[in-house]
Amino acid sequence: GVSIGQFQQVEQMLTDMEVSLRTMRSMLYQAAWAIETDQPDKRLAVALMKRYIPKTATEVASSAMQILGGLGYTESARVSTIWQDCRGNQIAEGTDQIMVYISAPLIMKEYE
């Protein structure tokens, strides 16, 4: 048999997931740096991060569940718990709409 990771569609999904994970990590570090060094755009960095990371983490977890098939939806699968946590964070950390409400004026001000 062939490993599931050797199918082209799964390879693409895994690659996209890794790109997303690295992008999320970079945004987190950039926002932390902006706060730590009291950058003028720290509010924007945090708002963008809080909008992007929960949404993207949920998408990555959904892809992992899709790769695992039915096993990914069982309560015993760790990815199912991760997906639930990610989805909960989308709500708990402030909805996407609130992050847009915070971000948009700051972005417009930056490019005036």
Residue ranges and their predicted role:
Residues 1-112:
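Alpha-helical interface subdomain recognition
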